[in-house]
């Protein structure tokens, strides 16, 4: 199985990082995205608007990929990152911890069905992931092993919508897409692509993570952030159509193309139906599921039952937020 490459530049950053005392609870949170904001980030954008209404200054920055966003968190350029940096924590001993599960892994291997009728046809063939160390790469590693194949050249293209366009233009032939872009590709190019079987996958796709010292010194800000995430996720799980309504009310992503705008309701309805947005923010149960998945996928070393949750997660914030919103 092809072994992923992990955050080489970050090892130096983590090792050389000095740790000056931070200002006590600044009521500000700087969040780094390793992707552009689009349909699948609308739930986060809605929650962040609610955080702002509670007096927290929110700054959202899009980086070119998750590696760069992770480095920004480690170096203190932003406070919070989004991803699943288990390998970064284990291999580089970066001083960061996951603290909230945003979504579970729901990606689909969409391929040109004439070229790749099944998994075996992909043996030795190119495959495209979102980024190094991403959930899509872990999923690809696992599925390749389960199907007895090894991919050929691996490329990394951040952004599911970017990969969808590349598929339809014929620039790539096989990749993972999220729900919205899988539906879009199937609608716009009927009969050309199909989704290969994946079986059951139970793992985090995106989680919030931050430097442990920042989490401990900004407890009130973190509490507000997580309370609003919990409430927003629960609102969406009760009524997925609220996302489109809130987007319009708040003026979010005003330049979203019409074809993607049409995917808002289908995306969130399907995502809710597949339990993509946890009501509880994850925590210990999510960590244990992640250990099983990411060790099997080759992104974590060791036996899942021997890994310590506290080495990767800081559980106190989500537990306090759940208590505050009753559940």
Language-model segment annotations:
Residues 24-159, 164-169, 173-179, 193-202:
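Short, glycine-/small- and polar/acidic-enriched structural segments
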Residues 217-301:
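Secondary-structure end/capping motifs
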Residues 288-327:
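Conserved C-terminal helix/tail region of periplasmic/extracytoplasmic solute-binding proteins
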Residues 1-8:
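Bacterial N-terminal signal peptides that target proteins for export
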Residues 19-23:
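Sec/Tat signal peptide C-region and signal peptidase I cleavage site
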Residues 8-18:
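Bacterial N-terminal signal peptides
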Residues 58, 151, 254, 301-302:
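Residue-level detector of short coil/turn "hinge" positions at structural boundaries
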Residues 85-86, 162-254:
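Pocket-lining segment of extracytoplasmic ligand-binding domains
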């Amino acid at each position: 199985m092809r072994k992923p490459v992990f955050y080489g530049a970050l090892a130096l950053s983590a090792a050389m990082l000095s740790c000056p005392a931070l200002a006590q609870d600044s009521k500000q949170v700087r969040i780094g995205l390793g992707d552009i904001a689009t349909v699948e980030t609308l739930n986060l954008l809605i929650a962040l608007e609610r955080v702002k209404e509670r007096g927290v200054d929110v700054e959202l920055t899009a980086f070119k990929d998750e590696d760069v966003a992770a480095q920004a968190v480690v170096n203190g350029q932003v406070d919070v990152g989004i991803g699943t940096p288990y390998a970064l924590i284990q291999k580089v001993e970066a001083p960061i911890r996951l603290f909230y599960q945003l979504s579970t892994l729901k990606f689909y291997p969409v391929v040109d069905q004439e070229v790749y009728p099944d998994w075996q046809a992909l043996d030795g063939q190119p495959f495209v992931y979102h980024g190094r160390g991403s959930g899509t790469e872990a999923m690809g590693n696992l599925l390749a092993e389960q199907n007895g194949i090894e991919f050929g050249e691996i490329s990394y293209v951040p952004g599911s919508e970017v990969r969808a366009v590349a598929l339809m233009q014929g620039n790539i032939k096989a990749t993972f897409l999220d729900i919205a872009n899988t539906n879009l590709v199937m609608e716009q190019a009927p009969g050309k692509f199909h989704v290969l079987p994946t079986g059951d996958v139970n793992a985090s796709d995106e989680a919030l993570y931050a430097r442990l010292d920042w989490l401990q010194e900004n407890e009130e800000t973190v509490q507000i952030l997580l309370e609003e995430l919990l409430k927003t996720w629960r609102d969406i799980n009760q009524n997925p159509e609220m996302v489109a309504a809130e987007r319009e009310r708040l003026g979010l992503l005003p330049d979203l193309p019409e074809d993607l705008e049409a995917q808002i309701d289908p995306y969130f309805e399907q995502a809710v139906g597949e339990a993509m947005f946890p009501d509880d923010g994850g925590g210990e149960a999510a960590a244990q599921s992640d250990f099983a998945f990411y060790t099997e996928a080759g992104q974590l070393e060791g036996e899942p039952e021997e890994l310590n949750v506290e080495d990767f997660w800081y559980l106190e914030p989500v537990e306090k937020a759940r208590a505050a919103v009753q559940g």
